[in-house]
């Protein structure tokens, strides 16, 4: 499998950060799938594909547009899909499926200045100005009392809003400290007084396979062929 994308090492980082955050054992279903698929390759239109993956989806996946790459012949298998069955989203009961972060105005201002290397003063407003497939943020705009900035693409947006100084509350009530990257770029922003509330879902970049989604599907009796078809539509499994 090909992960030679230095710019996007976040997808490896997401998984390792996630393991640290949750102190979780290796994903059994993914391990089992790897064993079962020994000697087989996943192809799309005759070419071996890069199987992007991340920790947890928000119920939807996104496409390469999240990284500023147009959809084309070679990446057409990375579509925005709904990770659900007739009973709803597979991951709906998992901690990272939904999360919230309350960031104080002064902390947000300092983080943005540090991360984007431009001081816009005290942040007055922060909004998602463009969204992409699956609802991922493609652009954010922050306006401060000394200027404004826009940040484009999933990874750069998560980096701009990352850093130490605030807590992220998962839907099960457990709390994680903020890290280098915002958990995902599937989020909305609300402002209340001096607090910016980021309401988000999922953990990781959201392109390709959700490891926890695959795990939940396997628990419900789905086999690896069905799981791969869900996350990489249009691909074929070949020896």
Regions found by a protein language model. Name each.
Residues 1-239:
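Conserved, single-site charged/polar hotspot
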């Amino acid at each position: 499998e090909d992960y030679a994308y230095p710019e996007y090492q976040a997808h490896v980082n997401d998984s390792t950060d996630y393991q640290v955050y949750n102190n979780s054992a290796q994903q059994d279903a993914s391990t089992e799938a790897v064993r079962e698929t020994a000697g087989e390759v996943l192809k799309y239109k005759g070419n071996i594909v890069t199987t992007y993956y991340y920790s947890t989806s928000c119920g939807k996946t996104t496409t390469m547009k999240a990284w500023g790459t147009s959809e084309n012949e070679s990446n057409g298998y990375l579509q925005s899909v709904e990770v659900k069955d007739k009973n709803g989203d597979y991951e709906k009961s998992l901690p990272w499926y939904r999360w919230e972060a309350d960031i104080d105005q002064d902390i947000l201002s300092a983080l943005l200045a540090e991360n984007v290397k431009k001081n816009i003063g005290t942040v007055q407003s922060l909004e998602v100005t463009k969204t992409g497939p699956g609802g991922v943020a493609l652009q954010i705009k922050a306006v401060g009392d000394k200027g404004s900035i826009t940040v484009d693409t999933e990874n750069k947006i998560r980096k701009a809003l990352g850093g130490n100084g605030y807590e992220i509350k998962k839907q099960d009530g457990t709390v994680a400290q903020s890290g280098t990257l915002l958990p995902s770029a599937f989020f909305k922003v609300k402002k209340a007084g001096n607090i910016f509330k980021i309401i988000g879902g999922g953990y990781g970049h959201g392109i390709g396979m959700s490891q926890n989604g695959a795990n939940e599907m396997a628990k419900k009796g789905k086999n690896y062929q069905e799981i791969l078809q869900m996350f990489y539509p249009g691909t074929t499994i070949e020896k």
